Amino acid sequence: FPYQGSSIMLESGKVNDYEVVYPRKVTALPKGAVQQKYEDTMQYEFKVNGEPVVLHLEKNKGLFSKDYSEIHYSPDGRRITTHPLVEGHCYYRGHIRNDADSTASISACNGLKGHFKIQGETYFIESLKLSDSEAHAVFKYENVEKEDEAHKMCGVTQNWESYEPIKKASQLIVSTEFQRYMEIVIVVDHSMYTKYKGDSDKIKAWVYEMINTISESYRYLYIDIIVSALEMWSEKDLINVETSAENTLKSFGEWRAKDLIHRISHDNAQLLTATDFDGPTIGLAYVASMCDPKRSVGVVQDHSSVNHLVAITLAHEIAHNLGVHHDEGSCSCGSGYTCIMSPVINSEVIKYFLDSK
């Protein structure tokens, strides 16, 4: 990269090697047509390592349910529910033109933010937010300064509660014509609400970007991940959130069965927390539990400033709920990739399920 050895602070953290690019939006609208802020399809051109890149994006229209709701709480404890218009959202997935194996997951809300794969390499892109608003940084994850070098792990072990496990994600694939849908509720606990200084717009953007990333990975299993609701515990936690992931998961499952399931139609609920779980654990979920009111849940620690890493942890715990166990030994997710169901989150880019691509 041209800026090797120089560092810059981005939302994703301190990046040491990066390239400044200027994405140019290519419009295909006929002359005189009214341009929407976030069109159904968009195309951007820029250069990476001196080579031209054409990024083709399509709006992720299946991101939200038709009756999507957002919930927060007033200081006196009243639940406040809104149904915002989300059709005009700014979350996209796509590919690089003339690269059949390429993928992209991009937020276009404030410049471009997300990641794309080209010629087997994954790059992240993020707006520099300078007075020159078109300037973006392109970088690899390996060039993000690590906050903590310790390995982070899923808390599911061989003796963790399970019904009938599906050994590999590939066993979930019935046929390419059989599309399935999973409606999920994301609950943001009070520690995470406080971490983002009560900025609900920032929290929503963080969560939506994660779900957009997850939906790309689950697409290869012919499962659409749809957000039914986002609930923020803005005043206080509605359960006892502990450093024990197991205790927190149990409490969250009981709360879902007693409360959440009776007011929001959904298949699965995930708790996002800024609480630092004991040991290396960053997530936990019941295995093969999708149809159980108390057990179709997971808990995920907001453990990184790199959205992609938290998103993959979330995708991992949802897969446990579906009945998928950890991958053992070697994993065929392509050169340079660790599979989503690896029990350890490390410094490699994590993208696919075993044998799903």
UniProtKB/Swiss-Prot annotation:
The active site is at E317. The keyword Metal-binding applies. The keyword Membrane does not apply. Residues 7-176 form a propeptide. Its EC number is 3.4.24.-. Zn(2+) binds at H316, H320, H326. CDD domains: ZnMc_adamalysin_II_like. It is found in: Secreted. This is Snake venom metalloproteinase H4. The lineage of its organism: Eukaryota, Metazoa, Chordata, Craniata, Vertebrata.
